[in-house]
């Protein structure tokens, strides 16, 4: 009878221990489920972060499109400036040709003026010589005087033509100076446009490089999310298996916690790097 009591007490004690172990196992299973739910929440948070990154990438692509549009506008402005410069060059060439013709006419007028002056001088010398000789031939004197008048008229006409040519030459020179100033202004404008176009090209290249790096980081991030999702599914399977083997579950959950901490740190590092990249892109 005593042996039966001892056996019953032992069985009761074993029953109590079994109940305690079962309660501990249930508690560990609940903890594992909580950890699994927390992992799911973190995955959802990662998915939201990915969506945010995709939105920011769309903004970067819009900025790239705007930069391309601005570059096309600069190219059109450069083409317009080149057309203006070509027109100025043609205008300068016409002015130079007109100047050459004016100079040629001036040479002719100057030669005629010299010829008229020589004729006037010759007539004056002849008149003085006739006066000294006391020539009384009035008709001859009249003729000489008429020749003198004609010579003087020719000289005056040559003077007027010379003044007109000089005035036109001054106007042509003024037009030429203004055309040269416009040409210099056009060349300065071209230099400014070329410099601005070079700066835009450099910024565009930097933006394309930054976008390529962001794309590479995004792909790496997506790969990391897929890995984490697979590991989460594996953790859920292990949580189900933990209901049948509490001791194995505890070890697996501890390992998952360490791995999750490591993934959080890695994700934080990736997020910081992406934030820095987008900050640089926004700065451009």
Curated annotation (Swiss-Prot):
Subunit structure, as described in the record: Homodimer.
Keywords attached to this entry: Allergen, Coiled coil, Muscle protein, Repeat
GO BP of this protein? regulation of muscle contraction
Expressed in which tissues: Ubiquitous, but especially prevalent in the anterior muscle bundles associated with legs. Expression in the mid and posterior regions is probably related to the numerous, small muscle bundles associated with the digestive and reproductive systems (at protein level).
Recorded coiled-coil stretches: 1-273
One cellular component GO annotation, for this chain's record?
contractile muscle fiber
- UniProt free text on domains: The molecule is in a coiled coil structure that is formed by 2 polypeptide chains. The sequence exhibits a prominent seven-residues periodicity.
* GO terms for MF: protein homodimerization activity
Q: What does this protein do?
A: Tropomyosin, in association with the troponin complex, plays a central role in the calcium dependent regulation of muscle contraction.
| Similarity remark | Belongs to the tropomyosin family.
- Please give the name of this protein: Tropomyosin
- Top-level division of the source organism's lineage: Eukaryota
From what organism does this protein derive?
A: Psoroptes ovis
